[in-house]
Amino acid sequence: MTQQPKIPRATAKRLPIYFRYLTFLHDAGTDRISSAELSDAIKFDAATIRRDFSYFGALGKRGYGYDVKALLDFFANVLDQDSLINVALIGAGNLGQALLNFNFHQSSNMRISAAFDVDETRAGTIMAGVPIYAMSELTEQITAQRINIAILTVPQGVAQEITDKLVEAGIKGILNFTPLRVTVPNNVRVQNVDLTNELQTLVYFIDNYGSITTGL
């Protein structure tokens, strides 16, 4: 992957959405698309799309729009789609098992390659094709499989302790499904996913703003 310019966090969060929809268009045989058409499909305003794309230079042509194949190839490079990314799942309970069954089937370059759990009856088994390891094997497997991203689905009470172990093992990114906002060094990035908070926010918007569609 080539060195990419620094872009705003909000733009970075939209890039996978662009890539997924461009993949759909390419598979459907669509050759080109305008920012207005893209806006209508993914519900981001056209000005936002054009601004996002402008961070990477001239990706389209005035009066023509965007070449779908060229844009897809460009974002595949930006998102490093040619590299297989192994991900560790920490916690093979109900949510963890759901994520194992999902296992990023819509992504061609990411997979959960190892899961870890404190329950000794789960360690040594295979769920949805993924081996479950004991927590004592965490550092060994993360090193052996060159994993630098982990998904955290453990109880809140042990979330920080497990996070510390992940950092010590060399993890650089954590997708945190626990309610706890874990503390990590500056060189480790955490993305928090709080389903309860998201639902409460959704209820608030419905109650106060109706069914207005909003983007990121």
UniProtKB/Swiss-Prot annotation:
It comes from the Bacteria. SUPFAM superfamilies: NAD(P)-binding Rossmann-fold domains, Winged helix' DNA-binding domain. Residues 17-56 bind DNA. GO terms for cellular component: cytoplasm. SMART domains: CoA_binding. GO terms for biological process: negative regulation of DNA-templated transcription; response to redox state. NCBIfam families: PRK05472.1-3, PRK05472.1-5, PRK05472.2-3, PRK05472.2-4, PRK05472.2-5. Belongs to the transcriptional regulatory Rex family. Modulates transcription in response to changes in cellular NADH/NAD(+) redox state. PANTHER family: REDOX-SENSING TRANSCRIPTIONAL REPRESSOR REX, REDOX-SENSING TRANSCRIPTIONAL REPRESSOR REX 1. This is Redox-sensing transcriptional repressor Rex. The lineage of its organism: Bacteria, Bacillati, Bacillota, Bacilli, Lactobacillales. The gene is rex.
